[in-house]
């Protein structure tokens, strides 16, 4: 029998969340962001479920797009960081991948690299995030260059990215949206600005195409709301099992550093999961897991391969019982808050030794 630490991916939850997105953005095309192994949920598990139900898959790089194509998935892919060298352009066009152009060097590569077929492109403009994107005043020259290049598909898109969408009260959001909407250069035939947070908070930003990421996987993009608040269902269940149970005397120190002890006899369960699997090491006291239909608190430090839970008040729990680390019952947003981070990071840091099921 293999180690019980695993990810359970729920296709029905994925489809429910996609339905919620389409309800919030009626009539809009959907680019499903599946970069970083579908936010840790597994591109092998996610892409076939979404194939044919969306406009395109959004990935960070060529390698991620090729991995999707190798699955036999036919939905188009868009490289959101574009190409990292001119050599990648021919591979992209041969596989019908669209490329985001965000820098003059990428535009130069494109203009100087004749291609056998017209390549689909999106132009990224910087409206205030100051990370990637052309300046607004550069867009006309970019468009002129693309229009005169015979190996560029003329269905050119324009996109930007909001820096503070997860904080809807920030004035920068409306400033960026307004700047984007004021761009009147002809030739851009489709536009996109809305990520998960903007889809929910700024309907006026939805434009032609929306780009859901974290909400697709049933996780809230906001610090003060969870998946249930937004009508989303977690796609990932991070699971393990009780591998050992020990009855300890009063004041027995548990785990590295002896950071936890009880003034009465305690019953400690060992769960086969730790920071080597992607569970955060630094969590606050009484962070829960879900066992036998109830929450049980983690005690002591999280180790590389295991963590310990207090079963003193739960005598019915046995070795082999299933444990949910996060998922349907214990939302990942809660664990992220306990660890002082965000759900995105926890999903993406699941290690390779955790198997998908």
Curated annotation (Swiss-Prot):
Substrate binds at residues 131, 304. GO terms for cellular component: cytosol. This is Alanine racemase. The keyword Isomerase applies. The gene is alr. Its cofactor is pyridoxal 5'-phosphate. It is an enzyme of class 5 (isomerase). It comes from the Bacteria. InterPro entries: Ala_racemase, Ala_racemase/Decarboxylase_C, Ala_racemase_C, Ala_racemase_N, PLP-binding_barrel. Its EC number is 5.1.1.1. Keywords: Isomerase, Pyridoxal phosphate. The modification N6-(pyridoxal phosphate)lysine is found at residue 35. One of its GO terms (biological process) is D-alanine biosynthetic process. The active site is at 35 (proton acceptor), 256 (proton acceptor). PANTHER family: ALANINE RACEMASE, ALANINE RACEMASE, CATABOLIC-RELATED. It comes from Legionella pneumophila (strain Lens). Pathway: Amino-acid biosynthesis; D-alanine biosynthesis; D-alanine from L-alanine: step 1/1. The keyword Endoplasmic reticulum does not apply. Catalyzes the interconversion of L-alanine and D-alanine. May also act on other amino acids. CDD domains: PLPDE_III_AR_proteobact (cd06827). Coiled coil: none annotated. One of its GO terms (molecular function) is pyridoxal phosphate binding. It catalyses: L-alanine = D-alanine. Belongs to the alanine racemase family.
